[in-house]
Curated annotation (Swiss-Prot):
Protein name: N-acetyl-gamma-glutamyl-phosphate reductase
EC number(s) given by UniProt: 1.2.1.38
Organism: Vibrio vulnificus (strain YJ016)
Key word rRNA-binding present: no
Gene name for this UniProt entry: argC
Coiled-coil spans in chain: none
């Protein structure tokens, strides 16, 4: 059994991870931690997340001795802020732990990226170079080999799973940039209370126009420019992305369908719906990404639906763990 620890366990993604670890036949939950100054420190996780009552009755402890935690852990999940993961990941890695980081701290190679888009100077370029990008369906070999897996972001997962099959098959005319409009539930902003996310104030609206951090992540890993506009939805969880692309001259509907089928053959977390339009309610509380599409002339619209807390975060992290250790990919996810 792999002794597994979750740092940042009080948040939504941390709670989802705790439940998966508890269900996993090859893992044992070694500890749940939050920052030393967190108001949640010392509380039982079932007190913070009622759905865990009677399932996990373990306190969320303040992280005061990271080295001690490392010595008692085989696997570390970091469900922490970018700067926190940046500081903690190297410590756990140096102690021999396998690390799955759900923040953006190690997703893109290149120190300048973090100064420009995250507002801090990256101090661990050696781990940036070694990190595997955790887009599970597209990076299995690197995930198997790497001690550090930087789990892909929620919007970037929804977008890339929809676009990559067509790019790899050279069916897209990238002179016309793919346009991604994606809407996320408010859980994507975390548990911390704010006016924007309060019940009476939350409203469907775009945000982060031209400057959302996931835009350069998408561009970097796709290898082509995109226009990305995220939206805040007035619902709890899920992401629906609608992506418009121009196809190369002469591309047929059959070629499009073949590209998706070939890309996701034996990839059980991606469900191809063809011309059936995906819905958030069909993927909510599941580890799946549903993809549907329509072709008209030289244009294609692809719709991608995921649960932002699961395929966009926790279940993808666990999927990466399953890949890394050679377990069945959906172990503990269903």
């Amino acid at each position: 059994m792999l002794k597994t620890t979750i740092i940042g366990a009080s948040g939504y993604t941390g709670a989802e991870l705790a439940l998966m670890v508890e269900k996993h036949p090859e893992l044992t939950l070694a500890g749940l931690y939050v920052s030393a100054n967190s108001s949640d420190a010392g509380k039982c996780i079932s007190q913070l997340h009622g759905k865990l009552a009677g399932v996990i009755e373990m306190p969320v402890l303040p992280l005061t001795d990271p080295l001690g935690v490392a010595q008692d852990s085989d696997v570390i999940f970091l469900a922490t802020a970018h700067e926190v993961s940046h500081d903690l990941a190297p410590l756990f890695l140096q102690q021999g732990c396998q690390v799955f980081d759900l923040s953006g701290a190690f997703r893109v190679k290149g120190d300048d990226f973090y100064t420009q888009f995250y507002g801090f100077a990256h101090q661990h370029s050696e781990w940036l170079d070694k990190a595997a990008y955790g887009l599970a369906e597209w990076n299995e070999e690197a995930i198997k080999a790497s001690q550090l897996v930087a789990v892909a972001g929620c919007y970037t997962t929804a977008a890339q799973l929809a676009i990559k099959p067509l790019l790899v098959s050279q069916l897209v005319d990238t002179n016309q940039w793919p346009v991604i409009n994606a809407t996320s539930g408010v859980s994507g902003a975390g548990r911390k209370a704010s006016m924007t996310n309060s019940f009476c104030e939350v409203s469907l609206q775009p945000y982060g126009i031209f400057n959302h951090r996931h835009q350069p992540e998408i561009v970097h890993h796709l290898g082509c420019d995109v226009i990305f506009t995220p939206h805040l939805g007035n619902f709890k969880r899920g992401i629906l992305a609608t992506i418009t692309m121009k196809l190369q001259d002469g591309v047929t509907k059959e070629q499009v369908a073949h590209a998706f089928a070939q890309a996701y053959d034996r990839k059980p977390a991606v469900r191809l719906k063809g011309d059936v339009i995906p819905r958030i309610q069909d993927v909510e509380f599941t580890p799946f990404c549903d993809l549907g599409w329509k072709v008209q002339g030289q244009h294609i619209i692809v719709i991608s639906a995921i649960d932002n807390l699961l395929k966009g975060a926790s279940s993808q992290a666990m999927q990466c763990l399953n890949i890394h250790y050679g377990f069945s990919p959906l172990t503990a996810l269903l």
